[in-house]
Design a protein with these regions (language model features):
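ATP-binding glycine-rich phosphate-binding loop
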Residues: 41-42, 46-89
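Catalytic activation segment of kinase domains across protein kinase-like and atypical kinase folds
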Residues: 188-252
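Helical subdomain adjoining the active site within ATP-dependent kinase catalytic cores
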Residues: 13, 234, 238-239, 245-344
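Short C-lobe core helix of eukaryotic-like protein kinase catalytic domains
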Residues: 168-176
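ATP-binding glycine-rich loop module of kinase domains
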Residues: 72, 76-113
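Catalytic-loop of the protein kinase fold
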Residues: 176-189, 193-194
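Conserved structural core of kinase catalytic domains
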Residues: 120-157
Length: 355
């Protein structure tokens, strides 16, 4: 059933196949950012471009040709704001600029560590006396929660499975590389979604003895906002006093981030989801003991794992990826690129008959 549904979803996506931005593209953008801010990195309005209208930047920005020098405000928080800008006049190389009064140094350091493992690419950091500026990848789909809320009627089961699989696999990779890493705030607002043209090309995800073959359906998840994050080599004084009520600590359970993400995903699906989200909700109910779902139980507080509770019954990554939810990626499915119809050969024009 799941495999057939997965194949039907792939067929529906075939018309949108295109070319996605690659790691080499991000590397090139990063080099241009560093070159641009070399002399006046504290004044992004003088070195970047933005679209010359009032529209919100999205996927169409790559086709925009009317631009002007400056940036566009796209978000604000307690300590600062986020702006959109481009390093090229054609606005094909877009970036985000986070400006705030509090230091962004730790967030930049952790961002650099995690960007190869499903984190948002960070390009540069500037300490500018009364403000701190971080230049990073621009993500056009917004937060995971907003993405689901605004597209609830168009998302298919394959999209939810893609989101779940990408996040869990990247957390698995992060903890293999940096076992001490804790994001500590991985809810649906701190995961961003990049929307691009699907390529339907496949990528292998290896978790122990499990190998998943995952198609590119035009959605890429990105971890962001490392304001409460830590590693054994990067301390974070802002987490002091958050251990009892929020379970946030360098000594929190290794699956702290995984649990918070799955619990948050369940809450978002309950609030905004439709029939397409039911399979994902059932997966979360199946994989996590009931005392890990919700806001407060003897195992969790404020939707998060309690620091001093016994979490030995929480599933490992191997157990999670062994669940039937991932069968469509474990089964041998017909090459997804073959769903793209072949172009019909052009018949040669008949030769004119002699008069």
């Amino acid at each position: 059933m799941q495999v057939e549904q997965h194949a039907r979803n792939l067929k529906a996506i075939r018309a949108m196949v295109g070319k996605a931005r690659t790691p080499k593209d991000h590397e090139a953008i990063g080099k241009q950012v560093l070159k641009a801010i070399k002399t006046i990195g504290c004044n992004p309005n003088k070195i970047l471009y933005t679209i010359n209208n009032n529209s919100t930047p999205n996927l169409s920005v790559r086709k925009a040709i009317r631009t002007k020098v400056g940036t566009k405000k796209i978000g604000a928080g307690e300590y600062g704001a986020v702006f959109f800008g481009c390093v090229d006049k054609e606005c094909k190389k877009d970036i985000a600029i986070k400006i705030q009064t509090e230091s962004l140094k730790n967030e930049y350091k952790i961002g650099k560590l995690i960007q190869k493992y499903g984190g948002m690419h960070v390009y540069a950091y500037e300490n500018c006396k009364d403000k701190h500026i971080m230049y990073s990848e621009y993500v056009n789909g917004g937060s995971l929660e907003d993405f689901i809320k605004t597209r609830v009627n168009t998302l298919r089961p394959i999209h939810y499975r893609t989101i779940i699989t990408q996040i869990l696999y990247n957390l698995y990779r992060i903890h293999k590389k940096y076992p001490s890493f804790r994001h500590s705030d991985l809810h649906a607002k701190n995961i961003l979604i990049n929307v691009d043209e699907p390529t339907l090309k496949t990528e292998k995800y290896t978790i122990g003895n499990i190998v998943l073959t995952v198609e590119d359906v035009g959605i890429k998840t990105l971890l962001t906002d490392y304001g409460l994050s830590t590693t054994d080599k990067i301390d974070n004084p802002t987490i002091e006093g958050l251990d009892i009520e929020w379970g946030i600590s360098k000594n929190s359970n290794m699956m702290y981030d995984t649990h918070l993400f799955l619990n948050a995903m369940y809450q978002v699906c309950s609030r905004y989801g439709n029939q397409s989200c039911l399979e994902t909700m059932k997966f979360i109910q199946r994989i996590m003991p009931s005392e890990y779902i919700g806001s407060k139980t003897r195992k969790i507080e404020n939707f998060r794992m309690r620091l001093n509770a016994d979490h030995s019954n929480f599933p490992t990554f191997s157990r999670i990826f062994s669940d039937p939810y991932f069968i469509p990626y474990r089964k041998t499915i017909k090459n997804s690129l073959s769903f793209i119809p072949r172009a019909k050969p052009i018949a040669p024009k008949p030769k004119p008959k002699p008069k």
